[in-house]
Structure formats: C-alpha cells, structure tokens
Amino acid sequence: MIYISPPFGNWVRHKDCIRVRGTFTTERRPGLIIQCLKTLRKVDGGWRNAIGFRNPGLENIEFKQDSIYSIAALDSKWYKLFGKLDKGINIEINVGCPNVNSYSITRPELKMLHRHYPNCSVKVSPHVTNNFLDILQNVGFKYIHLSNTLPTKKGGISGAKLKKKNLQLVKFVSNNYNFEIIAGGGIYTPQDVRDYAEAGAKHFSLSTVWFTPWRVKKVIEEIKLVSK
C-alpha cells in the first residue's frame, strides 16, 4: 500500500494512495499555518519543521472510512480517543514525534489500543528502542511505521538525512521482528523505493515528495513494481 503522510494527507488526494490525515490530538492545538510558515525550512539533505501537531482536536473532526487518522499520544489523556472514535475507523498512533513533549505510552495502554483497533499501525521514532519494539510485537501489532523525523534542536528533519538512518532501522526490524513495515523518509525517486524494498519494507509512505509533484508518478509506478 501507498500512504500520503501527514500533513500532506490532509489536502493531497491520489487514486493510488491512502490518505493519512492528522496528526490529531485530544485537545485543540491551533496555529497550523503560522507554524508551517515559521518553522518549515529546506535544509541540507531534507526539510526541517517544528509544526508540533497543530490541529482542530479530535472532537472537531468528521471521520470517514476512506482515510487513516493519525493520533498523537502526547499525554495520559490520549486514551479519551476510545470514547470518540468508532471501532471501524482506521488509525495510526504516533508515539515518536520530536516536536512535542514526549510521553511514554504504557504496555496496558498499548494492549487497550490493540484490542479496540487490531489493525492500528504505530509510528515510531528513528531512535526507537529494542525494548519498545519487543513490547509492540508481544502485544500483537502487525504494522509499524518507520519512522518519524530525525530530532534536532530546531525541529524534526525529513528527507535524505532521515532515509540514511531509516534504512538501517528498516533492515534491523525486518531481520528481527514480524511486523509489516511501512517505510517513509526521503522517498523522492524510484531508487529510494527500491532501497527501502530491499531493506524489507512492504508499504511506503510519501511525504515531502509532494512538494515536487512531477516526481510522484515514477515513484508510485516503482512502488507498484516492487509490490508485485
């Protein structure tokens, strides 16, 4: 499968892709456009941002079956989502964004999440620990999204710099765990797709390539080839 990663999934549509909308939090976090203008910058080897999940809040979202909804576990209140979302909604839990305060989601919370949404994917940090990967596999999660942006003092970096780190992570997870891997980070060319596929990715998440939409067709064609 091919995913359009947030924030692009909120606006971009493509017939061959699944939109991932969000990332949403239990409480409203205003200022998306302003934060994009203030922090989104082209840097050497990628893009840097410190958007920090600016969104209208879960209560103000109209959920649809044709999208996946990225939900952030920012604090212990995130469990409120169980009272707000139908079990038929497709979700991804984001536990590794560098632009917000960290919260260590617990094993009981992960068990509850998997019980309610067995097909939920988990998006993790590029610095995810073996212990956390062990917990995810033991709980029973099938899909893992590798990965969030690389943390820096000024925000998270995506693009080629992330790909270099992420390829190592995809290889490690593929060789040591039983997840279906969603790979994202620095996918701009057919070669990037092949690199991730050879490392063990089964699905692909497209993000800043949407800044250069003329690249997208060849990337998607290559994903279809490696997915046969």
Language model: regions and residue ranges:
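N-terminal capping/small domains of soluble enzymes
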Residues: 1-76
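Hydrophobic faces of well-ordered beta-strands that scaffold small-molecule active sites
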Residues: 2-6, 17-22, 67-71, 89-93, ...
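Glycine- and other small-residue-rich loops at beta-strand/loop junctions that grip anionic moieties
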Residues: 5-6, 50, 102, 125, ...
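Catalytic cores of alpha/beta
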Residues: 13, 77-85, 127-139, 171-183, ...
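Glycine-rich phosphate-binding active-site loops on the catalytic face of alpha/beta enzymes
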Residues: 22-29, 91-97, 143-153, 187, ...
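Surface-exposed amphipathic alpha-helices with a cationic face
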Residues: 62-65, 110-117, 137, 170-176, ...
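Hydrophobic alpha-helical segments and helix pairs
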Residues: 81-110
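Glycine/Thr-rich beta-alpha phosphate-binding loop at enzyme active sites
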Residues: 95-105, 126, 130-179, 213-221
